[in-house]
């Protein structure tokens, strides 16, 4: 690793941003923080600008003037850009080498797709880019010779366990000589693994966001509690590794030590192990194909008391079943599922519905919303139109329960 990479961290104020910037701060000889973006936590974004002095920063359109004023008062000469247009501009900037796509939800799709079309090196934490626009995204990566490296611990683990030829070209996974039989995504089971469905019905927001192993944002923590997070990761894995959903298994592994596995035709299982710390996959992707110090606590094998593997209960965790069904149906269904889930999770976080209502609302949305299937050449406007329709319909479903 000789050249300094210029990094744009989109979603810098979230948990992925925290972990990424901790690594970048410790490796100034390798990385230059060229651009940052944030949405809600602008005080934190200002502090990050003071720490890293990026050349550009993205904020909501309505906040551009005020944020520029605050930067000026702090003695910082940083260009401020606003809204989706600003994020796309940062992602496609000729000075940007690597885009860390860490914006949560559908809001991260346009800038991530733009980065792919600009041939950038993309470190992907935004699941929705593949859940909503999987084949479109993969086609853009290949057509424009971009590089796509997964930051999710599970997908990063699988990536590390695959032969180099498949890492370079996911269609190589079908070659018999590589012998890939199945992929195994591990799941923690979330905070309600040992509780009944009835207990889940009574769960508070505070209980749902208290993940047993990982430190994450509220939305992804709720998704972990319902196992929708694993459902979205299943869809993401299908696109990343060019496999149908029936070639990807999900297993609950409460200790979160094995981050995922690849099963080979000779009976071998290759697994990636590590402490449950997002800095490990982020450091891998930042430095790939080299390795750097992530700053994470090394795994102490002597402290491990045992590793468990449990089959998911698809009645209790219906969101996982819905994700498989949506993947079988097509991209239009995965867009609907993702949009419905975002609205339902928001309603739960606002104490409008129960945790277990999320799966019911998601299933209703899938059953009730009728749209045409998308082709592989669908554009972003078609994708966002289905997303918008699904959100509007789901808002009505939530209103019936409030």
From Swiss-Prot:
Binding site for Mn(2+): 152, 154, 233
Cofactor requirement: Mg(2+); Mn(2+)
Functional pathway: Isoprenoid biosynthesis; isopentenyl diphosphate biosynthesis via DXP pathway; isopentenyl diphosphate from 1-deoxy-D-xylulose 5-phosphate: step 1/6
Keywords for the protein's UniProt record, in alphabetical order: Isoprene biosynthesis, Manganese, Metal-binding, NADP, Oxidoreductase
Top enzyme category: oxidoreductase
Matches recorded under Pfam families: DXP_redisom_C, DXP_reductoisom, DXPR_C
List of residues binding NADPH: 13-16, 126, 128, 217
Alphabetized InterPro entries for the sequence: DXP_reductoisomerase, DXP_reductoisomerase_C, DXP_reductoisomerase_N, DXPR_C, DXPR_C_sf, NAD(P)-bd_dom_sf
Family label: Belongs to the DXR family.
Record's protein name: 1-deoxy-D-xylulose 5-phosphate reductoisomerase
């Amino acid at each position: 690793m000789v050249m300094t990479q210029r990094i744009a961290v989109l979603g810098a104020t979230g948990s992925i941003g925290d972990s990424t910037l901790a690594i970048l701060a410790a490796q100034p000889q390798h990385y230059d923080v060229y651009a940052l973006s944030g949405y809600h936590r602008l005080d934190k974004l200002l502090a990050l600008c003071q720490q890293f002095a990026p050349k550009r920063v993205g904020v909501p359109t309505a906040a551009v003037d005020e944020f520029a004023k605050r930067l000026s008062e702090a003695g910082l000469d940083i260009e401020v850009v606003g809204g989706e247009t600003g994020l796309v501009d940062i992602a496609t900037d000729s000075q940007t080498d690597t885009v860390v796509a860490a914006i949560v939800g559908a809001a991260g799709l346009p800038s991530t797709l733009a980065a792919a079309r600009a041939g950038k090196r993309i470190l992907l934490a935004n699941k929705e880019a593949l859940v909503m626009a999987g084949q479109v995204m993969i086609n853009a990566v290949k057509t424009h010779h971009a590089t796509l490296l997964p930051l999710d611990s599970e997908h990063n683990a699988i990536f590390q366990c695959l032969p180099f030829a498949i890492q370079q070209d996911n269609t190589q996974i079908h070659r018999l000589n590589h012998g890939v039989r199945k992929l195994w995504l591990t799941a923690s089971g979330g905070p309600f693994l040992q509780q009944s469905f009835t207990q889940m019905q009574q769960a508070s927001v505070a209980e749902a966001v208290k993940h047993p192993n990982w430190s994450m944002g509220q939305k992804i923590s709720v998704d972990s509690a319902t196992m929708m997070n694993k459902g979205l990761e299943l869809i993401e894995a299908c696109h990343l590794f060019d496999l149908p959903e029936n070639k990807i298994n999900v297993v609950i592994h409460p200790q979160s030590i094995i981050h995922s596995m690849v099963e080979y035709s000779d009976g071998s299982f290759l697994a990636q192990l590590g402490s449950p710390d997002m800095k490990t996959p982020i450091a891998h992707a930042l430095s790939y194909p080299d390795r750097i110090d992530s700053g994470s606590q090394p795994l102490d094998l002597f402290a491990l008391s045992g590793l468990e593997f449990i089959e998911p209960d698809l009645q209790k965790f219906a969101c996982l079943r819905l994700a498989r069904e949506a993947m079988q149906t097509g991209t239009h269904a995965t867009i609907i599922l993702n949009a419905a889930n975002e609205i339902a999770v928001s309603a739960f976080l606002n104490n409008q519905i129960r945790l277990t209502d999320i799966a019911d609302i998601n299933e209703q949305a899938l059953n009730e919303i009728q749209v045409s299937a998308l082709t592989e050449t669908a554009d972003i406007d078609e994708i966002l139109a289905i997303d918008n329709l699904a959100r509007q319909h789901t808002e009505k479903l939530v209103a019936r329960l409030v």
